[in-house]
């Protein structure tokens, strides 16, 4: 949670800073793309690494390394875009370990029957920092510059690493010491475990359906990430401060969505929650991108926070509920890679076609992708969830 606060401050400040000094969607998109490349190249492999390591200390080391990487920016002259891109790549390279390690540690510390509640609580805390993080980031950028955002992120990583080191984990989850093996044997075992994890996804119809649905949503999100900055600055005529407010409002919606998910979990089946929230995402996004009025965008973004949480958490929980624990890291490593690939494609489309086709047109296309996800997933997800409940999955 603490490192997430620094992340949000930094994530809001960086694209605004780059767009301010370059006025280019290509430059702004390059930052997002460079952050996705490590996830694409090493996401699934990172999951295999995590499965064979102590999850808690993996998270601690990742936070420390990311803090050191960001600190290097203070030794680079201001305005050097290449330096920001290089450090962003290094930071996200080690960061590929964080998601699979975090998901695996969560499963290791609670019962599977309480995963929905645990994930909902996690989302609530994540969205709480999302409320204050963007507003702080946008304001600090306007007042003190990008340096304060970097310093805040470094501080948050260091505090997070200390707190993670104090987490108590079951002895069965600690790193197991095995017999000595040769480097070649370890390498073959490493890639063998990674391949087995990918085969689980490819041969399980429910996992494949969920991954397909996520691919459309992350494609749309990649486009939005790049284009939302020029939309707010150019189309709406706002500043970094208002941009931070808009992102914070979505965090408020996320808090409400997490609370609603806790209440609806045992009353409403996963299928209608997922499909209805995806279709709502498309409608809300279309309205937001075609009515550039600040107050109206506030309202739409708040509702988008609600529907985003419901669809994403329920889809992720379906994976957690059914994946064998020894494959958990590998499955979410593959998920991390899928997210990176589809977001990278979306970011590339937005970066290179944004100035040619126009910001609003491409944002409308991204909104329609949410509708497509709901339509594609309607029959496939419903059928595979029925099969899964009857134990007929591959």
Regions found by a protein language model. Give the residues of each.
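Membrane-helix boundary and inter-helical linker elements of multi-pass secondary transporters
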Residues: 20, 51-52, 77, 108, ...
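Helix-loop junctions on the cytosolic side of multi-pass membrane transporters
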Residues: 104, 108, 150-183, 378-391
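Substrate-agnostic recognition of the 12-TM MFS/MFS-like secondary transporter fold
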Residues: 1-11, 34-48, 54-67, 83-142, ...
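Transmembrane alpha-helix termini and helix-breaking/packing motifs in multi-pass membrane transporters
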Residues: 13-22, 72-75, 132-154, 234-235, ...
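C-terminal transmembrane bundle of multi-pass solute transporters/carriers
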Residues: 41-44, 58, 62, 82, ...
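Helix-loop boundary and gating motifs at the non-cytosolic
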Residues: 1-38, 199, 203-250
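Juxtamembrane intracellular "pre-TM" segments in multi-pass secondary transporters
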Residues: 170-211
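MFS-fold secondary transporters
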Residues: 19, 72-73, 91, 164, ...
């Amino acid at each position: 949670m603490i490192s997430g606060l620094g992340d949000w401050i930094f994530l809001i400040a960086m694209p605004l800073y780059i767009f301010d000094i370059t006025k280019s969607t290509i430059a702004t998109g390059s930052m997002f793309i460079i952050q996705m490349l490590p996830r694409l190249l090493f996401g699934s492999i990172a999951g295999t690494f995590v499965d064979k390591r102590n999850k808690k200390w993996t998270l601690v080391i990742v936070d420390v390394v990311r803090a050191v990487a960001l600190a290097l920016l203070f030794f680079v002259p201001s305005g050097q875009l290449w330096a920001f891109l290089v450090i962003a790549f290094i930071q996200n390279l080690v960061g590929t370990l964080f998601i699979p390690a975090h998901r695996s540690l969560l499963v290791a510390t609670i019962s599977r029957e309480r995963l929905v509640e645990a994930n909902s609580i996690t989302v609530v805390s994540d969205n709480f920092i999302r409320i204050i993080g963007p507003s702080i980031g946008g304001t600090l950028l306007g007042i003190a510059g990008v340096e304060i955002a970097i310093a805040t992120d470094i501080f948050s990583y260091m505090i997070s690493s200390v707190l993670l080191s104090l987490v108590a984990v079951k002895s069965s989850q600690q790193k197991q010491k095995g017999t000595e093996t040769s480097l070649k044997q370890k390498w073959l075992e490493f890639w063998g475990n990674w391949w087995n994890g990918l085969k689980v996804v490819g041969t399980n119809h429910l996992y494949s359906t969920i991954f397909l649905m996520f691919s459309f949503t992350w494609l749309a999100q990649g486009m939005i990430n790049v284009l939302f900055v020029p939309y707010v600055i150019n189309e709406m005529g706002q500043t970094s401060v208002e941009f931070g407010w808009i992102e914070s409002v979505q965090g408020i919606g996320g808090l409400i969505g997490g609370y609603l998910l806790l209440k609806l979990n045992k009353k409403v089946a996963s299928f209608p929650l997922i499909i209805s929230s995806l279709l709502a995402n498309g409608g809300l996004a279309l309205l937001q991108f075609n009515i550039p009025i600040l107050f109206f965008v506030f309202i739409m973004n708040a509702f988008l926070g609600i529907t985003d949480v419901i669809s994403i958490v329920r889809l992720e929980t379906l994976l957690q509920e059914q994946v064998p624990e020894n494959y958990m890291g590998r499955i979410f490593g593959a998920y991390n890679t899928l997210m990176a690939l589809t977001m990278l494609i979306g970011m590339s489309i937005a970066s290179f076609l944004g100035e040619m086709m126009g910001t609003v047109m491409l944002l409308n296309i991204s909104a329609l992708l949410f509708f497509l996800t709901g339509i594609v997933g309607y029959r496939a997800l419903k059928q595979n969830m029925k099969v899964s409940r009857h134990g007929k999955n591959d």
